[in-house]
């Protein structure tokens, strides 16, 4: 804890409000709310915490707070601050969690369409459906039963669907409002589960068609009846009152929370939403934050009722969700919340079981790798790869795997400083010497195994640096790729030999992941350097364009091509004078002409 934080902790009020934790860059990394700011914020810097909270606290170098009049106001502010700043340690709802709806449009000749976007007063919406496949299946069934407008043909023209009896042409179908009202009511009844009358009508038509020997038409009616029956069986009835409601349950364990939401429409369970995330606040408060974010997403349909668990404050939920909030006390409704909670517990336990299985699998891979190489268990592995194009912008990268998992905070990038031209051996020598001379000098944690991307030559260079130049005793291995650029051989020993490694073993998959990761990291860094060098060389020697303005252009436009496509006004909007903008554009044009000339 630094002096700034110590001082600020003394000034915290005993009031409700929001607090914003910041990292060394001044970026907001966590937003929370509290009934008592003094107690809550101080709790982060006192006593012991679980690992994930310790990680959060280790990044905090400053914080701000905003005092509010009430806990409700603090909750609303917290939700807005999270939406605005998207802090990395706050709850993040899954992307694209909008569900499909069926919509009857408000047009003169209404159409039945599928949409994921709800607009107020823009038509009638039915759903949501669990996925686009289900929504399409229901729509196909409705299209065959109800002749909505399907085409955009002009008056006096009919379309293909009209001949199938699935579309009404402008001048042929009824134009009076009463007809459309009846059709829409029929659809509403059908989607609300009141489809007995429709089935009776279809059955009558099927029998009539059979009597007329129109067996194909009778078969169509039979298939429609079968389709309705299938749709019924896919929906589990959860309540007899046919009400639309969302049912929330949650469970917490080991610093993680799982929230389950049952979407019940017309008494039927049509879908559930599952979200698992680490929480850093009180469980009840983080659950409220989740609910606020959930319904702030405009694509989430707000039902007539929302059921919540007993521990949650009804008034706070009512402040963020504009519908009837119910905390069931007994009977069927309480059982529904209990069922959602039970499912949350099961989902969380499944996560822990899978995690434990993955840990055992990875731990076994590391152990087996150590036995194969006859070294201590390689808990920490550091892997290296070079990247350049014909010697230009040469770079190298190091990735670190701890207990078989990437430790991205330990990754390092290297610009090659002493090598001229494409010399992978010399580049590897420079990078390894820079890395491990520092490890030796500063007493940094050394790896249990070093892996270099390459064959015998690269491994021998690495061993020469580690053993002879630096006098270290760290095992060095090499990973060779085949002609398809895939992990193929593990080289190790003295003399170097190919280690027999079963292709389907966990240790092979681990090495494959390491090699892919270091290659990805090196290539990505090389692209960044190459782009920056290209960017800088093009913009060098322009009067009035110093390092800060070049950096500004690079951050905003990313590439020279993007600058060339931008207007003068767009570049000037960054605060760059018009005369400098004109010089930039002229320089880019001149460079282009130079390249195109013979």
Curated annotation (Swiss-Prot):
Alphabetical keyword list: Cytoplasm, DNA damage, DNA excision, DNA repair, Excision nuclease, SOS response
Tagged with keyword Ligase: no
Example GO BP: nucleotide-excision repair
Residue stretches making up the GIY-YIG domain: 14-91
Assembly behavior: Interacts with UvrB in an incision complex.
SUPFAM superfamilies: C-terminal UvrC-binding domain of UvrB, GIY-YIG endonuclease, RuvA domain 2-like
Cellular component GO terms held in the UniProt record: cytoplasm; excinuclease repair complex
Organism the protein comes from: Streptococcus pyogenes serotype M28 (strain MGAS6180)
Location in or out of the cell: Cytoplasm
GO MF entry, a single one: excinuclease ABC activity
Domain called UVR: residue spans: 196-231
Protein name (database record): UvrABC system protein C
Membrane-crossing residue ranges in chain numbering: none
Primary residence: cytoplasm
């Amino acid at each position: 804890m630094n002096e700034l934080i110590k001082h600020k902790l003394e000034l915290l009020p005993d009031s409700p409000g929001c607090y914003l934790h910041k990292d060394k860059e001044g970026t907001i990394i966590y937003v929370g709310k509290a009934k008592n700011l003094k107690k809550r914020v101080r709790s982060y810097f006192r006593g012991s915490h679980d690992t994930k909270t310790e990680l959060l606290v280790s990044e905090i170098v400053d914080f701000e707070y905003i005092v509010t009049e009430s806990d409700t106001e603090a909750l609303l502010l917290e939700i807005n601050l999270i939406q605005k700043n998207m802090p990395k340690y706050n709850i993040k709802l899954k992307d694209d969690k909008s569900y499909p709806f069926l919509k009857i449009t408000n047009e003169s000749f209404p159409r039945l369409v599928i949409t994921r976007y709800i607009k107020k007063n823009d038509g009638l919406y039915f759903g949501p459906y669990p996925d686009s496949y289900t929504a399409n299946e229901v729509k196909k069934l409705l299209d065959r039963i109800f002749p909505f407008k399907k085409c955009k043909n002009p008056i006096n023209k009919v379309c293909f669907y009209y001949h199938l009896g699935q579309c009404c042409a402008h001048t042929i179908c009824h134009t009076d409002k009463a007809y459309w009202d009846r059709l829409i009511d029929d659809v509403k009844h059908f989607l609300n589960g009141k489809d007995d009358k429709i089935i009776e009508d279809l059955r009558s038509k099927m029998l009539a068609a059979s009597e007329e020997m129109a067996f194909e038409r009778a078969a169509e009616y039979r298939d429609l009846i079968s389709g309705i029956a299938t749709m019924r069986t896919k929906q589990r009835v959860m309540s007899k009152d046919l009400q639309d409601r969302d049912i929330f349950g949650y469970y917490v364990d080991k610093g993680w929370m799982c929230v389950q939401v049952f979407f019940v429409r017309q008494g039927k369970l049509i879908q559930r939403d599952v979200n698992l995330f680490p929480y850093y606040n009180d469980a009840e408060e983080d659950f409220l934050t989740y609910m606020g974010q959930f319904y702030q997403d405009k694509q989430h349909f707000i039902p007539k009722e929302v059921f919540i668990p007993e521990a949650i404050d009804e008034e706070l939920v009512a402040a963020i969700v504009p519908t009837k909030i119910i905390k069931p006390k007994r009977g069927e409704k309480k059982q529904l919340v209990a069922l959602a909670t039970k499912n949350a517990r099961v989902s969380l336990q499944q996560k822990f079981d899978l995690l434990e299985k993955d840990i055992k699998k990875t731990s076994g891979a590391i152990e087996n790798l150590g036995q194969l190489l006859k070294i201590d268990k390689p808990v920490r592995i550091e892997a290296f790869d070079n990247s350049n194009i014909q010697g230009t912008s040469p770079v190298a990268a190091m990735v670190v795997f701890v207990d078989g998992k990437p430790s991205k905070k330990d990754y390092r990038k290297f610009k090659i400083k002493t090598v001229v031209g494409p010399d992978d051996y010399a580049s590897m020598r420079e990078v390894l010497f820079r890395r491990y001379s520092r490890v030796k000098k500063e007493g940094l944690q050394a790896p249990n195994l070093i892996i270099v991307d390459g064959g015998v030559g690269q491994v021998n260079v690495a061993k020469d640096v580690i053993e002879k130049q630096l006098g270290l005793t760290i095992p060095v291995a090499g990973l060779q790729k085949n002609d398809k650029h895939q992990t193929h051989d593990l080289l190790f020993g003295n003399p170097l030999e190919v280690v027999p490694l079963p292709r389907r073993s966990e240790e092979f998959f681990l090495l494959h992941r390491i090699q892919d990761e270091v290659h990805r990291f090196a290539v990505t860094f090389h692209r960044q350097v190459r782009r920056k060098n290209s960017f800088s060389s093009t913009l060098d020697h322009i009067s009035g364009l110093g390092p800060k303005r070049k950096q500004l252009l690079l951050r905003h436009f990313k590439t020279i091509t993007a600058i060339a496509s931008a207007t003068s006004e767009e570049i000037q909007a960054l605060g760059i004078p018009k005369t400098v903008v004109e010089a930039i554009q002229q320089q880019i044009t001149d460079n282009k002409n130079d390249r195109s000339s013979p």
